[in-house]
Amino acid sequence: MFKKKRPSRSFGPKLKNNPPAPPLRAVREVSSGGLVFKRMPRGVQFAVMLDSYGKWAFPKGHVELGEGLPEAAARETLEELGLDQVRLLEYLGKIDIWFRDRFEKHGALVHKDIHYFLFEALVDAELHPDPAEHAYEAKWVSSKQLFKASSYPDMVPIIKRALALVEQGV
């Protein structure tokens, strides 16, 4: 009437012979960027741009092979903001970020060092953002508005250093 079940020869659930998952590795990247200001009769103004994430930021980008950090920062200000006559003043520091790439590496974990430099532009410098370089809008903001204009909290120490240097007359 009832068929007898054969006893199992294993002790516990059957497991597939899967190798352990490899450790999660991050892609390392180095970028360089600039905080650009100009001295106006009514005070200092800094350039900010609307980036591909819809946030106000500063120009930055990957350092190309054979290129130094300051040269990369100057090139990025030219490509993203159209500023070709800027004067390098000072190294501002580095921020270290981790994120998931959504453009080139599609979800890859990225560990990026971003080096920032302080540049001075000519008084009559105009901003010409380039959407092809992920700079969708750009504007000059006063030093008082700079903290509110920057959308990224990790930029606070860099902004503080830039403002202190400009205040000292560098």
Place the predicted regions along the sequence by residue.
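Short aromatic/basic micro-patch
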Residues: A57, H111, W140
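Short, solvent-exposed loop/turn segments that connect beta-strands within catalytic domains
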Residues: M40-Q45, K105-G107
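Acidic, metal-coordinating catalytic segment for phosphate/diphosphate chemistry
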Residues: M1-P41
